[in-house]
UniProtKB/Swiss-Prot annotation:
One of its GO terms (biological process) is mycofactocin biosynthetic process. It is an enzyme of class 1 (oxidoreductase). Coiled coil: none annotated. Belongs to the FMN-dependent alpha-hydroxy acid dehydrogenase family. Its EC number is 1.4.3.26. Disruption phenotype: Cells lacking this gene lose the ability to utilize ethanol as the sole growth substrate. They are unable to produce PMFT(H2) and glycosylated (methyl)MFT(H2), and accumulate AHDP and glycosylated AHDP. Involved in the biosynthesis of the enzyme cofactor mycofactocin (MFT). Catalyzes the oxidative deamination of AHDP (3-amino-5-[(4-hydroxyphenyl)methyl]-4,4-dimethyl-2-pyrrolidin-2-one), forming an alpha-keto amide moiety on the resulting molecule, which is called pre-mycofactocin (PMFT). This reaction occurs via a 5-[(4-hydroxyphenyl)methyl]-3-imino-4,4-dimethylpyrrolidin-2-one intermediate, which converts to PMFT. The alpha-keto amide moiety is the redox-active center for the redox activity of mycofactocin. Is required for the in vivo ethanol assimilation in M.smegmatis. This is Pre-mycofactocin synthase. Its cofactor is FMN. The gene is mftD. The lineage of its organism: Bacteria, Bacillati, Actinomycetota, Actinomycetes, Mycobacteriales. The keyword Oxidoreductase applies. It comes from Mycolicibacterium smegmatis (strain ATCC 700084 / mc(2)155).
Length: 399
């Protein structure tokens, strides 16, 4: 009798269930956290269910092509890894995610708050976009960008939509400032209830890394997470002139992440960006912001012929990806979905999540009678009246 554990899971929802089962409560809560009441994070997911398909009954293509490019990188499906901070839910963290993305032929955004240095991540995946928050002065920001370029990053993602919202109805995740002996003793009762997670970390002979090595110079441990976070809170928010300045400094593809308004999308184009991501920071930003998919169609129509438009927020199925692409996205970025896979099964779990999305994309293309994601059009999607949100659009003359 084969007693080997079946590690494969069928849906992203099952990956989430496994992550909840295997992680200490405080660690798992950091993966589901959202700002305030959680209106936006809920809308991100549930809004996709409001969209329908217009399938064909005969003439489905024998083969379906999902390949595309994002910021100059050829990828095998229109899904890339979104940058998320401190992936210490698994000892291999961002390195495991990068390996999984490479194995499935796609690119990865690496957070400047990552738990692994960029040099280690680029070593296993040469399609890395480095993400930067506006933290510190221009010299410090430029130094991080130059380190990323030297390491081999092929693009820059700038995230500026964070508003430091306070208060979560279900409580904020309890992340210690440092993993010293006192902290480990305090957390031990909780960790003992999750022996598999404890065993994974025990094998490494080191506690979870709560430092952010990409905020310092190469070879340094970097500051503790909360020290860097505090500096970020104390840094004046960037202006459009700052974005244009950084764009001039970076010789390569450049994405502005967090765009939800048409007027901001147009300003981003004027600043010279290569791509934008229609996003509300996964519901971790200003609660009450519309779901990204609601804002996508109007933004894509306004600037989609000038820059690459991506979407992130709420992707749980391949059919969600197809809906986003049909409504104007070049590709989507995923966050919580792959973190749950990482927590559940490490690199294999992330690969599993990408395989789930690939299968769902293929099935939806077949049903719609489309041989390629590039053949998708808005008419393939049933969009109910009142679904879209046109933010930052001047009122019509005479209205």
């Amino acid at each position: 009798m084969n007693m080997a554990r079946d590690i494969w899971f069928e849906t992203v929802a099952i990956a989430q269930q496994r992550a909840r089962k295997r992680l200490p409560k405080s660690v798992y809560s950091s993966l589901i956290s959202a700002s305030e009441k959680g209106v936006t994070v809920t809308d991100n997911v549930e809004s996709f269910a409001e969209l329908g398909f217009a399938p064909h009954v005969v003439g489905a293509p024998e083969k379906r092509d999902m390949a595309t490019t994002v910021m100059g990188q050829q990828i095998s499906l229109p899904v890339i890894i979104s940058p998320t901070g401190v992936q210490a839910v698994h000892p291999d963290g961002e390195v495991a995610v990068a390996r999984a993305a490479a194995a499935r032929g796609t690119a990865m955004g690496l957070s400047s708050f990552a738990s692994k240095p960029i040099e280690e991540v680029v070593a296993v995946n040469d399609k890395i976009f480095f993400q930067i928050y506006w933290l510190g002065d221009r010299d410090a920001i430029l130094a991080r960008a130059e380190r990323a370029k030297a390491a081999g990053a092929v693009g820059l993602i700038v995230t500026t939509d964070w508003s430091f919202s306070h208060g979560r109805d279900w409580g904020s995740p309890k992340i210690p400032e440092k993993m010293d002996l006192k902290t480990m003793v305090t957390m031990m009762p909780e960790a003992l209830t999750k022996p598999r997670w404890l065993w994974q970390w025990g094998k490494t002979m080191r506690p979870p890394n709560l430092r952010v090595p990409n905020q310092g110079a190469r070879g340094e441990d970097g500051p503790p997470f909360f020290q860097a976070y505090g500096e970020w809170m104390g840094t004046p928010p960037p202006t459009w002139e700052d974005i244009a300045w950084l764009r001039e400094q970076w010789d390569g593809p450049f994405m502005l992440k967090g765009v939800i308004r048409v007027d901001d999308a147009k300003r981003a184009v004027d600043a010279g960006v290569s791509a934008i991501s229609v996003s509300n920071h996964g519901g971790n930003n200003l609660d009450g912001t519309p779901a990204a998919i609601r804002a996508l169609p109007v933004i894509a129509e306004a600037v989609g012929d000038q820059v690459e438009v991506l979407l992130d927020g709420g992707i749980r199925r391949g059919s969600d990806v197809v809906k986003a692409v049909a409504l104007g996205a070049r590709a989507v970025m995923i966050g919580r979905a792959y973190l749950w896979g990482l927590a559940a099964e490490g690199q294999v779990g992330v690969e599993n999540v990408l395989d789930i999305l690939r299968g769902g994309i293929d099935s939806a293309l077949m049903g719609l009678g489309r041989s390629s994601i590039h053949d998708l059009v808005p008419e393939d999607i049933l969009v109910p009246e009142g679904f879209t949100r046109a933010l930052g659009v001047p009122p019509a003359s005479g209205s």
